[in-house]
Structure formats: structure tokens, C-alpha cells
């Protein structure tokens, strides 16, 4: 069905087709921990990371080190002179990629002796957790409205950074002269 997610589809296929294994190519598994535990065949998740998988899961994942790569991006912003760096982060309940990327941001600031100002962290709404241009735009508008000072912004997704750029340009900000922007994902 339309509202069916990756885990629902997998559980259905296991039952119908008697699968012996599954490979997930991405997906959003944040709200599915209890249902993930019901998958009784080995599975691999590509391009998604888990901080913790349910016990007794026969699972592996293939992903980059989101924490380290985020830290490298924020390190670069710090090394180019930025001391007030905002982040467009995932929702507060995210325990996967978004959490790891936020941890990398925090680690980089601390490593450069900079304070982590919670006012510069803009979280996705829990109702709509997609890393989209629309959400990046909305989040940047929200950050600008707070009048929190920042010279750079790191978005945890390239799609979000595109939306953020649109919001910055609408407010008359020049990129990178007024605000440097950096995104994550390697979008072409």
C-alpha cells in the first residue's frame, strides 16, 4: 500500500516468497525498531547507519562514517575562520544518521575550542523528518527569524542545503560572502 514502508514490505515478502535474505538500498528505519526485530532472515542495509540495532537481529549495514565525515566538514569551516556555525539537523529523536552527523558537528566545534550554542542548532520537525529542499528552506527561515548570529551553516543533507540557500538569498544574504554553506551526501 501507499503508506507501507521498507520494513512492512520486507515482512510481507518474507512471508509470501519465503526469502532467505534481504538487501535494503537505503530507507528510513528510525521508527521501525520493534518491527525490524521481527525480520527473521539475515539482512543488509546499504547507505543507512544504526547507532544500535535490536538484539537478535541478523543484520549488517554498509555506510560511511557519518560522525567522522560531518566532523571533517565542520573542521573545514572552522579552519577557514568560522566560529559561529549553525546546523540544520535531523529531528531530536533520530538515533541513526542524523544523530551521528550532529555528534560530528558537536565534536568538531569542541575540538576547535568553540562553544556549542544550542540556538544555532535547528532541528527538523518530528512530524516531517525528510531531508528535503522544502525542509531546508523552512528550517533556514526559522533560524533567520531567531536572529541568532552565524557565519556558516552545515546542513546534514545536500537537499536541505539547497533549500537553505534559497532562504538565505531571499533574505539578501550573499553566499559565501555573508554565510558559507556546506552540505552532506555528495549530491550531483
Label the predicted regions:
Residues 9-15, 21, 33, 37-188:
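Bacterial carbohydrate/catabolite-sensing allosteric modules
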Residues 2-4, 24-30, 159:
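Short beta->alpha connector loops
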Residues 1-6, 118:
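Conserved nucleotide-sugar donor-binding subdomain of glycosyltransferases
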